[in-house]
From Swiss-Prot:
The species this protein was found in: Arabidopsis thaliana
GO cellular component: cytoplasm
Location, primary (coarse class): cytoplasm
Catalytic activities: S-ubiquitinyl-[E2 ubiquitin-conjugating enzyme]-L-cysteine + [acceptor protein]-L-lysine = [E2 ubiquitin-conjugating enzyme]-L-cysteine + N(6)-ubiquitinyl-[acceptor protein]-L-lysine
Annotated protein name in UniProt: E3 ubiquitin-protein ligase PRT1
Gene transcribed to yield this protein: PRT1
Amino acid sequence: MAETMKDITMKNDESQEEEIPDQFLCCVCLELLYKPIVLSCGHLSCFWCVHKSMNGFRESHCPICRDPYVHFPSVCQKLYFLLKKMYPLAHKKREEQVLKEEQERECFSPQIDLVLDLSVCSGDSLNVSDKQKVEECSNAANLLSSSSSRGDIPCIPKNQEPTDAKALNVHENELLKDNKVSKQISKDDLLCSACKELLVRPVVLNCGHVYCEGCVVDMAEESEKIKCQECNVCDPRGFPKVCLILEQLLEENFPEEYNSRSSKVQKTLAHNSKGNIQSYLKEGPSLSNDNNNDDPWLANPGSNVHFGAGCDSCGVYPIIGDRYRCKDCKEEIGYDLCKDCYETPSKVPGRFNQQHTPDHRLELARSPQVLINFNSIGILLGPVISNEGMDTDEGEEGPPGSSNESSSTE
């Protein structure tokens, strides 16, 4: 009984100390955004909430604005660490909750703290200056590196915390002791990945890195493609929209500097000479080549569509065309690439914490004959025909391992 009362007190203390604004609550699970994903429309949801709501047979839709999308973006690490810093208690609770669910499914989201860049660990943005804390982060990163080089798969068994959580527990506890300091947002938390200045009209690329809108326009003008300067991966979606929640955070915490920089960026955009960029800014890219049929592959049984299979690099889901599957990744969920990502390899890790390395072998996978294998064609087409109310995406995907053709972004 004593322990129960203690738990209740802790929950009450948490609610009093950390009142989380609505904008930082996931629109799907209504809890603190955990490992936030920013869609091309600029709206946010948790990693697993986006994954579960995606459709394995057709394009998916944002639960807020119904904007269509076909790519499962990477976690926005800048926003992840910002929320962890602002709401450490709620974030820790969400971490434990999600980890328990992942252990039950034996399928894990990216372990962000393990691959944390030392520049982030030791910077002022996390208020960490103690050498010991930097060494803890370094040891965690070295552990992942050594495991990968030996070919070991650092899977997380049930009833056991991930290595990164153990390594950073001391760091988290010390942050909680000085809650006021840990919640302070510094300018370093919100710098553009290109100009290294305070973000203005922030946009989040498919890879999860954050830029000023004007900096992304400059990228597109130079190469007609938006190529991230941090990971060198091209955004396959066209021009993303401004993340309004991040913009609001910037305006509230740095009003003078933000307004000053914003006026300069707007002048740059107004004098932009590329008409196609202005078109992207207003309308966004088109997801379908056929305006009369959003799902042309459903009408053609011979279409090379890998239903329920997604690319672990660009996140396209489902994969249309050639699909390459790793023969050496041991995780049950597997590791897949679309043709474009196979031909332009990158160092982007698997979206589900797979320990894929460049020396792994990939083979061409055949697309399943879904229309033939289904007992009733209505099972496949039913959700596509019904577009009323909330998207029926989440009910169409089975748990990892439910099919031999299950994918890393199923």
